[in-house]
C-alpha cells in the first residue's frame, strides 16, 4: 500500500478518506515505507487536504475494497493526454496558455495545479495527424477494465470548428460528433460541447473557426506577418474567416503557415486572449471559453 500512496504523492493526486483511514495510511507508510517513500509522503503536505474548488473540478475515483490495485496504479501513473489534430505544431501554444492562466483570479489554485502537471510532464499532447485520425488516436492503446477503456478517463480531444459562422456544424465531422456525443451534426447543440458535464472521453471544439482566430492582430504583426488582408473585417467575420489558409485556400494573413503558430504566443497575455472570448454559464458562473477548456484539462489529471 505504501508504494501506491507515495505514487499518489509523486503524481500530485489527493486522497479523501475518514480520519481512521487516514490514521491507518500514515501508520502503514511509517512502518512499511522505504526511506524514499517516506520522504515523498512528507513532501506532499496537502495529500489529505483537498480544497473544495479542487475537489469540484478534479475527477474523483471511488476506490472500493475490491478495486484492483494495478488498475488504480495505472490511473495514477498514466499521463493525462490531449488528443490534438495538429499537436506537433499546436501543443506548445496550449502549454503557453496554461502558463499565462496560472494567475487567473477565478481559478488560480486550479490552474496552478494544471501548470504543475504540465511542467512535470503529467499532461501531454498526443498528435492525431488530422481530424479524421482523432477517433483512432483516442482509442489507441486502450486499458480495459470490465469491458471499459479506463484510459479514456485520462483523455481530452480537441479539434477545430472549421465553419464560416457559429450557427452551423461541419458535416465532415459527423463521425466525431456521434463518437463523442451520440448525436448527428444536425442535432448537436452548444450545451453538448461547452460544458463540463461530458462522459469520457472529454472533448472540446473551438467556438471560433480555429486556434488562429484567437490571436489578436498585434501578435501576427509581432511575428512578422502581413495582416493587411484582414483589416476591415468585423469581429464576427474575423472569428470565422480562414486566416491560416489550408491546402486549397491561401492564408489571409500573408506569410503565415501552420508551422508558424508557435510564434504567435510570444509575449501573449491572458488579458489579450480574454478580450474576444465567448462566455458560457457553467454551474451558475460565467466563464470564458479558454477557462472552460483548461478546466476540461484539469478533469483528466
Where do the protein language model's features map onto the residues?
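RecA-like P-loop NTPase motor core
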Residues: 29-163
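Extended hydrophobic/Leu-rich segments
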Residues: 4-5, 9, 17, 69, ...
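Hydrophobic, Leu/Ile/Phe/Ala-enriched alpha-helical segments that form helix-helix packing faces
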Residues: 97-105, 141-146, 176-193, 297
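Residues that form generic nucleotide/phosphate-binding pockets
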Residues: 137, 214, 218, 276-279, ...
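Interfaces and regulatory segments of ATP-dependent nucleotide/adenylate/phosphodiester-chemistry enzymes
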Residues: 1-46
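Activity-critical C-terminal alpha-helical subdomain
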Residues: 160, 164-269
Amino acid at each position: 500500500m505504501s508504494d501506491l500512496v507515495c505514487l499518489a504523492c509523486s503524481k500530485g493526486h489527493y486522497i479523501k478518506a475518514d480520519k481512521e483511514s487516514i490514521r491507518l495510511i500514515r501508520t502503514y507508510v511509517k512502518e512499511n515505507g522505504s526511506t524514499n517513500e517516506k520522504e515523498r509522503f512528507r513532501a506532499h503536505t496537502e495529500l489529505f487536504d483537498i480544497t473544495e474548488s479542487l475537489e469540484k473540478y478534479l475527477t474523483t475515483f471511488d476506490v472500493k475494497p475490491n478495486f484492483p490495485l494495478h488498475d488504480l496504479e495505472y490511473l495514477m501513473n498514466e499521463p493525462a493526454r490531449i488528443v490534438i489534430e495538429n499537436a506537433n505544431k499546436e501543443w506548445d501554444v496550449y502549454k503557453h496558455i496554461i502558463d499565462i492562466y496560472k494567475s487567473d483570479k477565478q481559478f488560480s489554485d486550479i490552474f496552478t495545479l494544471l501548470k504543475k502537471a504540465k511542467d512535470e510532464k503529467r499532461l501531454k499532447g498526443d498528435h492525431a495527424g488530422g481530424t479524421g485520425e482523432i477517433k483512432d488516436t483516442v482509442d489507441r492503446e486502450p486499458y480495459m477494465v470490465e469491458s471499459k477503456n479506463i484510459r479514456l478517463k485520462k483523455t481530452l480531444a480537441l479539434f477545430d470548428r472549421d465553419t464560416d459562422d457559429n450557427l452551423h456544424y461541419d458535416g465532415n465531422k459527423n463521425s466525431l460528433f456521434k463518437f463523442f456525443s451520440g448525436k448527428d451534426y444536425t442535432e448537436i447543440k452548444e450545451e453538448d460541447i461547452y460544458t463540463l458535464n461530458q462522459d469520457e472521453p472529454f472533448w472540446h471544439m473551438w467556438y471560433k473557426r480555429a486556434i488562429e482566430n484567437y490571436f489578436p492582430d498585434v501578435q501576427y504583426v509581432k511575428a512578422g506577418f502581413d495582416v493587411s488582408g484582414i483589416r476591415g473585417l468585423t469581429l464576427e467575420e474575423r472569428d470565422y474567416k480562414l486566416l491560416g489558409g489550408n491546402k486549397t485556400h491561401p492564408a489571409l494573413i500573408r506569410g503565415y503557415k501552420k508551422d508558424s503558430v508557435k510564434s504567435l504566443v510570444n509575449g501573449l497575455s491572458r488579458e489579450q486572449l480574454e478580450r474576444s472570448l465567448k462566455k458560457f454559464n457553467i454551474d451558475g458562473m460565467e466563464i470564458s471559453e479558454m477557462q472552460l477548456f483548461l478546466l476540461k484539462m484539469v478533469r483528466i489529471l
